[in-house]
Amino acid sequence: MVLKEKIFVGSLAALLVISSVFTVFFGIRVWKPAPMVDIPSAEEGTVTLSSIKETETDYENQDFSDKIKDGVLTLEACGAEKDSLYNYGPLIRSAIRTAIQNAGTVLEFQADATYYAAPVDSPNSAATFEFGEDEIDGLTIKGNGSRLILLDNFVGCFNFSNSNNVTVENLSIDTLEPPNAQGTVTAFDKEKQVMTVETDRVYTMFDDPRLQERLTTKEANGTVRNKNNPYLLKENCTNYYFVNSYKKISDTEIQIMLDPQTANLTNNYIEVGDKITLNNRKNTSTFIFNFMYSGTTTLKDITIYNSAGGGIVGLQNYGDMTLKNIQMIPDIRKGIWACGTADGVHIQASRGKVIMEDCLFSHLVDDAMNLYQWYGDISKVVSATEFDAVTTTSPLQVGDTIEVIEPGTGRLVGTAKIKDLQPLNGQRVDRAAKVILETPISDMQTGVETGRYYWYNKDKSFVGTEIRNCTFQYGRGRGLVLCTTDTVVENCTFTSLSNQAVQGWFNGTEGYELQNFVFRNNTLTGCNYLTREVDNGQNGMVQISTNNNAYVQSTYLTHSKIEISGNKFTDYHGCALGIGNCRDVTIKNNVFNQKEAANVYKKNNSVYISNSQDVTVEDNRFQDDKPGLTGAIRYRAASVRNIVIQNNTFACEQALEIIKE
């Protein structure tokens, strides 16, 4: 029976004294007790998690199969939800579970509504909606423009790991309180490294005991920094400072003691009047969307305003991921950072490609996007056609063609196709496997164990990835970190990033090779100001080189088939484009416009090339608005082989610098 009674309430006070109200969900009205909450006025700030009483635990494991109509399960918002902060967590979890159990069901939110949700076991949950072990195969969630607000700012939102064919669209996600706290320095004792901060009224995170628990531990030699400590960030400054302790001294002021290891930095940068943010460092593994070990995934028209850690994470995915019109931006009412401690998008070791279009990443503390494939360790060589391997770095399948690499030098030992995969030591083959090859790799020495050889599956490394019409701006990290195969980045904009706009590098923790890479018709302005002085100006806004951006001599050139064309580089801090350990590189039809004098950033050049071969630089325009470039094109003669420089236009003081040593 569908009830259609209407309730007229003259005021919020009247609403709160009513003993019961009608709640509307799944198209029917259900009698429920009114939640008892303390609702402060807007002048008194936002409501904290401690003021919310969860009264709907009986809805935690409901089966709403009988509410499905024409393949759609609709979750409607309570009429009083904006005032009562009704916790929809149990209802949404039950609705998702019902949709999973009824294949093909679409879960729809009410259009343009607001849903508050808490996890089952706060603060111990990793996600508000935990379905990582449900092995989902087919799920569609349509937000219809609604806003989902997480009541616990220390956890993520959706964990859909081990899933396939999942689509989420047209939904905004926020937290009631951001995963950081913001304020203004009102006093600073440089000798004691103690500051007083007047907090913005919207922030109440200092009241949460979980933050206090994440401060440093006490050891025999006194207080030491813990890697999980919160840390301070200063607006428009690249340094951060670890926090040892804090205490509230009034309703609006806190006193913060900084870690002595960062004291030498604070003397130069922290001043009274500075705007600072206290970041919850421990939540690096907390993401709004978690798609580890997953297949086909689609996210469309999603806005993320705040995240305790990062935005979207995936590991060892075997299917494609499509991201369209994803926005990770700060809510201007709640502070300056969108993602608290981790990357906007972080996908590693994926067999599938990533298609990303029309996305915006703004004011992220870490990188906007990481896509990379790792080498896997060969734990023991049994024979020229058989070895034991750690396979957690990338999902292997029979028929894959893999390379065996010598770590350190990057030397290619050999290539072969996988004939068979067998479980190793009782583990799944995507954790550890005995790898049988179709043909022998004769240079692989039998009997050697961990650390001598790595395997690499480059032909299944994000092959076919496309990133188009996206904007990356005002972040403290990098724009794109890519170690992939067959990737196109086109018509994107990179503005005012502390680090590189794009980085591809040979690195033990963030991938190894960038192959068949096209970077075309992009605009880059004012990036890389964090690293401009540590590398003598040779670190580029676009940087493709070896570990830690070094330009080292190597017989094996890691990156290959690189095209940089039709881009506009403006106002770069030290270098626009850095190329190292690359082969078959084309730099064509770009515009380089340097606006800073050389004495500002030690050594200014537009293009820097080292330890590479088969490089063509042609039909580019180099313009220096201020004199003093050390060479628009700068390269090392001893390590660059077969370089062609032709048909370029130079409107600068020095066109070319060849380093002889």
What are these regions (language model features)?
Residues 21-42:
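Sec-dependent signal peptide cleavage junction
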Residues 78-79, 89-100, 104-139, 144-159, ...:
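N-terminal extracellular ligand-recognition/capping segment immediately after the signal peptide
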Residues 118, 150-157, 177-182, 285-287, ...:
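Short glycine/acidic-rich loop motifs that flank beta-strands on beta-rich extracellular proteins
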Residues 136, 143, 153, 158, ...:
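Parallel beta-helix/beta-solenoid
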